[in-house]
Amino acid sequence: MDSLDEEQIGALQKAFDSFDTDSKGFITPETVGVILRMMGVKISEKNLQEVIAETDEDGSGELEFEEFVELAAKFLIEEDEEALKTELREAFRVYDKEGNGYITTDVLKEILRELDNRLTEEDLDSIIEEVDEDGSGTLDFNEFMEMMNG
C-alpha cells in the first residue's frame, strides 16, 4: 500500500465498500474485474485470473481489502509510469524540431534551464558531461529518458 497515495487508497476503499454490499470484508474475483474496468484498466479475463491468483494470499478465492489494494496498485502504478513516458516522449518530440531522433546538448541546456532556473552554467555543463557519455553533442530519446528518470 506504500506505493499509493491517500486519495487513491480512499477511492479504492469506496469502490471496495460499494461492492461489498453485505459488509463481509471481501469481494469476488468477478467484482475485481468490474472495479478495474470502471477505473479504466484494460485487462483480459485470463490476465485478471492470473493476477488474482497471485494476490489471493490466503487462497480463499475472494479478495480482502488489502489484497485488492495490492492488486489495484500494480495497475495504477503501471499506468502512471506509462503516462510519464508518453509525456516525456512528447516533450522530446517538441524539442526535436527536425525530427531526426535526437536533440543537441544546447537544446538540453534550454530544457534544463526551463525546469530549474537556479542551475548555473557549471551545473549545466556537469549534467551534460554526465549524460552525453560518448561526447557526440547529442542525446537520443533513450538517453533523454535515462536522464529524466534518474
Curated annotation (Swiss-Prot):
Pfam families: EF-hand_7. CDD domains: EFh (cd00051). GO terms for cellular component: myosin II complex. SMART domains: EFh. PROSITE patterns: EF_HAND_1, EF_HAND_2. InterPro entries: CALM/Myosin/TropC-like (IPR050230), EF-hand-dom_pair (IPR011992), EF_Hand_1_Ca_BS (IPR018247), EF_hand_dom (IPR002048). GO terms for molecular function: calcium ion binding. Ca(2+) 2 binds at residues 132, 134, 136, 138, 143. Gene3D superfamilies: EF-hand (1.10.238.10). Ca(2+) 1 binds at residues 56, 58, 60, 62, 67. The modification N-acetylmethionine is found at residue 1. PANTHER family: MYOSIN LIGHT CHAIN 1, 3, TROPONIN C-LIKE ISOFORM X1. Belongs to the troponin C family. There are three different troponin C in lobster. This protein binds two calcium ions. Troponin is the central regulatory protein of striated muscle contraction. Tn consists of three components: Tn-I which is the inhibitor of actomyosin ATPase, Tn-T which contains the binding site for tropomyosin and Tn-C. The binding of calcium to Tn-C abolishes the inhibitory action of Tn on actin filaments. This is Troponin C, isoform 2A.
